A protein has these predicted regions:
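N-terminal "arm"/small-domain region of PLP-dependent enzymes with the aminotransferase-like
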Residues: 1-48, 141
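Conserved core of the PLP fold type I
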Residues: 44-171, 175, 180-183
Length: 183
């Protein structure tokens, strides 16, 4: 077995799929670099973080007007959260449904945890084929549905009515993955 290697980009291509910046955050600000280094030196990085994350949850509730009754789950990036949610529903016969093409981790995690994976093709213009999605939900009764919004890798958004129709039809958990919402 050999280590995974990221292929070099062809000439003239720009990598946009990993939410990475080609610019170093401190390249033009030695002062900012020094401030970050000082803060990092004081951080207890030898300890696990507080699992309750109550301070962060309170800040998120205030910043985004999240009701106290709503649960907040935090993780180390969306890959971890997708994995945890998939593990949550993993049992024999359970299914995961996602639009295709979409973020590869939906299919990957379904396969890793032994879940059936149902990929519903997008239309030729990458819009959601809502009748096909609703038909697949009715036929397979997935425990988990992923809607990447805007879709990764196409960048196409779906209407609020379409997303709500998926939520209303799904018998299980619906994850609206807005990792690329800012883009």
């Amino acid at each position: 077995m050999s280590a995974y290697q990221v292929a070099a980009l062809p000439e003239g291509f720009t990598k946009l799929d990993a939410m990475e910046s080609p610019y170093h955050p401190f390249a033009h600000s030695p002062q900012l670099q020094a401030e970050w280094a000082a803060r990092l030196a004081e951080a207890p990085i030898h300890l696990y973080p507080n699992p309750a994350t109550s301070g962060l949850q309170a800040a998120l509730r205030q910043a985004f007007d999240i009701p106290a009754a709503a649960e907040i789950a935090l993780g180390n990036g969306s890959d971890e959260l997708i994995q945890l949610i998939t593990m949550l529903v993993a049992k024999p016969g359970a299914a995961v449904l996602a639009l295709e093409p979409s973020f590869v981790m939906y299919r990957h995690n379904a396969q890793v945890y032994g879940l059936d994976y149902i990929g519903v093709p997008l239309n030729d213009d990458f819009s959601m084929n809502l009748p096909a999605v609703l038909e697949a939900i009715a036929a397979h009764r997935p425990a988990l549905v992923f809607v990447s919004y805007p879709n990764n890798p196409t960048g196409v958004g779906f209407s609020r009515a379409q997303v709500q129709a998926v939520i209303d039809a799904a018998p299980g958990i619906v994850v609206v993955d807005e990792a690329y919402g800012a883009f």
